[in-house]
């Protein structure tokens, strides 16, 4: 055994060993050594995008998963930890353009490198189950599901709004539009309506919402709230304003302007209606109003993202059109509002300035009437400024509302809904913020949509026998539109129905389709004739999912939806895919920058900066190492390329070893909280591992000489050491169960301190206690630092008795070891802590009272005979003087 810790040698040896025995290959229905079924546990990290290199967020995520795997495996579970690649998407196209290579070439090269990085981390991944989203054997089943969902009406086609770059002749994602211009061309972006495919996720809205509350107790409350809010159930009234506006002799929208409101009690306060720029009434009015035409064009340049629209300036323009109020018969002016989405509800809203803050601001801006129709006792309405109580539906009563005066919110809604229903102009309705999922993307690098366009037959689904529709991997995007439109071999095909020349669909699927079910494909790897098979029934639902909070809504919601569709198709037997969810915190680091005269900031990596510290070790100034000139200290932020504050995991592994990187990321913070990077912390983790190795080396002879021993006969000093090791084991085991790995590392450090500090003689008793303590210590530390503990386990001979540490039985707390002949009891005098005493564990009340009264510290605070002495057995003596 080497006397010095060499991470490179230790870790290579461990990797070679694990590879030789195919250590992490998982099988279904695994048995224990007694032939009994092991309990399965499926733990999975959200699959990464193959961007080229792992970042510290990856390291933290996968280490959490790996620690969980190793702990559970030692506890007898049949554990699965797979890995795959979210390999389609826009970043690959951008990188391909920058490097003039096909996205496929860039993607596969990145995957190869990132796999070597994962291997160097010692992750317990079953690579036989690897899936890659851009491989035809995977996306074939995206296409198969698309066709099944199309057949059942769950997928349908309609026009949708996209960002169109007129120079590059391509569709841009919202994040590629900067200040209304294309990120590459700088051209003013146009909103275009094009046919797209949608999935009816709204058909599952109620079930998705119900299951958030009733079937996801193992999810963080924060995520469940985010999902509920995203689904956004609203109970209200949908009703129509009427009109006689006609075009070419036909009433527009059958003479009705439909709106939805959750505040039907304020219907008598309507002073205007606002419609989306794309609404039929807006289009009609614009034909005779050039100014309105320009305004609508301006609106279409804006964002269609709700978050953006919520914060942008609300603008409007009157159409010159009026609709009739369904209850009063009064004419209400119709405006075009840039804040109204055509894709939300009916693309129109009623305006009640007196009781809606947005409408109030809009009315003030454009000098529109404000009519209060709700009164809150003790309050006086004024149209000068908005007050929160104007929107109070809990305490308000209707006023200025005729027959509804005096009614509270619910009474008014019920009465108004009934009257609207009687008129045939409205009804109570439940709506959802959630909208159907647009899965079409006008991009190349994605799953081809399996549709063929025929002039005679229309849109024809690709026959199942012809799947997969294989995406050509030789295209190099140049920014001038989807290269599939120029790929003759892909594009031209015979119609499956009539046999005439036809054309393939060139849109591809949203990459969220890929990530909606990949975790099930891990369970049925290499299944060529089914999307999932019986192996999926064994592993799913997943026991523990691990990923960032940024995926709390879209990915997780789509995965839940996809699972329910698969259930309804008879492919799976469960409702929810992920039983437990852990959202790990971000990894933070310091930021440093210089700002030029124009305000542009240049960011410098922390490794290139030297700090000047004050006498308390706090940074007071910083200079760039290369030129010695000052840089600004920007504070601690999430590691990112934009702030140039990332740390290369591979550099850390090369310098210190994977176990150091793993130990630091687990120790520095609880898994669900943010982790602040610390070079000193990394050094500290490495020092600890060197101590671990040195202790193992120094105790090798003692362990070799250890033999079976009756622990009941141990001397008191040996019992004390054993008691402490088992107390720490008990704590660590509990922390592993709670996924509090930072305190597991603390327990490991405490145990090493305890073992190092033990002053025991060279006797069979000492050898037995140290050997047991060291074997417990190595198993506690193993899930976090598997390489060094594997090496020491082998070198010290523990493998002979317990087998490979991977499958060594988890140490059990010995209740006898925790027993103490004496206990410490605290003493309070008049409610204040004044001292403590050591008494026999079985001491009677009189003995305890006598010992407490004899304590020197206590005697200072009592005069004469105490009024009362209360003994709380095993804990406390309370003296009332």
UniProtKB/Swiss-Prot annotation:
A GO term from the CC aspect: cytosol
A single BP term in Gene Ontology: leucyl-tRNA aminoacylation
Motif mapping: 'HIGH' region: 48-58
CDD domains, sorted: Anticodon_Ia_Leu_BEm
Keywords annotated in UniProt: Aminoacyl-tRNA synthetase, ATP-binding, Cytoplasm, Ligase, Nucleotide-binding, Protein biosynthesis
Binding site for ATP: 641
InterPro entries (UniProt xref): aa-tRNA-synth_I_CS (IPR001412), aa-tRNA-synth_Ia (IPR002300), Leu-tRNA-ligase (IPR002302), Leu_tRNA-synth_edit (IPR025709), M/V/L/I-tRNA-synth_anticd-bd (IPR013155), Methionyl/Leucyl_tRNA_Synth (IPR015413), Rossmann-like_a/b/a_fold (IPR014729), tRNAsynth_Ia_anticodon-bd (IPR009080)
Presence of the UniProt keyword Repeat in the record: no
Subcellular location as annotated: Cytoplasm
Catalytic reaction equation(s): tRNA(Leu) + L-leucine + ATP = L-leucyl-tRNA(Leu) + AMP + diphosphate
Primary location group: cytoplasm
Pfam family, one: tRNA-synt_1_2
Entry similarity comment: Belongs to the class-I aminoacyl-tRNA synthetase family.
Official protein name in the record: Leucine--tRNA ligase
Name of the gene encoding the protein in the UniProt record: leuS
